[in-house]
Amino acid sequence: MTMGLRAPHWVAVGLLTWAALGLLVAGHEGHGDLHKDVEEDFHGHSHGHSHEDFHHGHSHGHSHEDFHHGHGHTHESIWHGHAHSHDHGHSREELHHGHSHGHSHDSLHHGGHGHAHREHSHGTSREAGAPGIKHHLDTVTLWAYALGATVLISAAPFFVLFLIPVESNSPRHRSLLQILLSFASGGLLGDAFLHLIPHALEPHSHHAPEQPGHGHSHSGQGPILSVGLWVLSGIVAFLVVEKFVRHVKGGHGHSHGHGDRHAHGDSHTHGDRHECSSKEKPSTEEEKEVGGLRKRRGGNTGPRDGPVKPQSPEEEKAGSDLRVSGYLNLAADLAHNFTDGLAIGASFRGGRGLGILTTMTVLLHEVPHEVGDFAILVQSGCSKKQAMRLQLVTAIGALAGTACALLTEGGAVDSDVAGGAGPGWVLPFTAGGFIYVATVSVLPELLREASPLQSLLEVLGLLGGVAMMVLIAHLE
């Protein structure tokens, strides 16, 4: 019971810690936006002032009254046109082009305007060049920062996993493991519906308003439909892989489903903790009444009562079959870490500050996600050390994604950070894999009979996993 009561405390402490870090990140973003707005206002004021001086000096420089009158009319219209274009954010090239067309004395006007325009261009390039020097790092420093941040994100969750008092899928750890599994299911579903799928749709929502009204209604449906199809493709692909692996594993025993149901004596020591599929649930409901089950089986179970524990082939077969869900989760996590690596590499290409901010956001996202993956692997039959080693393998995907982002030239950094990096099918396909693992492998484990307190803790764990993803989605 103490083990069961420790888990909510860990979840609560984790929620408070990650929430505090999230508020710090949100405060940093708000400060940056305010600073950017002040800079924009100051730049717009200085631009208008310099142009006003130029207009005054230019109207002062003409001596012929009739030409000045004609020019004043033209210049007034140009000034009006510039004010309109300035409100819309157009550059100075349009004003210079209008002056060149409107005046016959091109040499005098072009000379006076060219001096003022050159001064303004110099000031603008100097202001724009300073952030470029700050943000764009040299190659060695860029790779060091990006790969170091990726290693940090991959290694940081292990410190949390060391604190989880679960060594294996044993009865004394079962209540805590069930709570961690519920947290994992909430994290997987929240990650799929609040992070991966919205980011897959985000590039299309950005491009849609730029299109004409007639094209928006037709072209906007195609990309959105493709995202939904890729999500379904991920679910179907994971289903096909699991059925194929189970068929191959069950080929040695002629019929896997029949063999598992035929050997209930074996499953009462191993299967109550490892069975994930629906066809094995009838045996799990009867495992608590071992004596009654043996009486029901009669002569079939009598001869097997003795050699149940030493019969390692049956146990290995059941354990290996039930680890399929764990390996499927690892495959989905590998693809997900690849997208995280793409985001980190692309953000550091945009600047050190943006890279650090993205690293903190991904770290907040990865810690609860890795805890859930650890619970799924332990539930699938791995020991604590095996589960941590397998999770370390998924760090290869993050490093590969970071390297791809650093080696790829071009592309908008904002779209990469938003999750649009890489092929458009990666995010929705990964989301489909997460949905499959959460609904097929994890949620059925939460349907077993449990005490009211245990059931309440499991529901709270699921809501805690979703709440973490809501917080992270808000920060992003």
From Swiss-Prot:
The effect of P198A is: Homozygous mice have profound B cell immunodeficiency and impaired transition from late pre-B to immature B cell
Task: Give the Basic and acidic residues compositional bias ranges.
Answer: 35-109, 257-292
Swiss-Prot/TrEMBL induction comment: Down-regulated in an insulin-resistant, and high-fat diet state.
Transmembrane helix listed as a keyword: yes
User: Which tissues show it?
Assistant: Widely expressed. Highly expressed in the intestinal crypts.
- Identify the GO cellular component terms for this protein: endoplasmic reticulum membrane; Golgi apparatus; nucleoplasm
UniProt protein name = Zinc transporter SLC39A7
Q: State the organism of origin.
A: Mus musculus (Mouse)
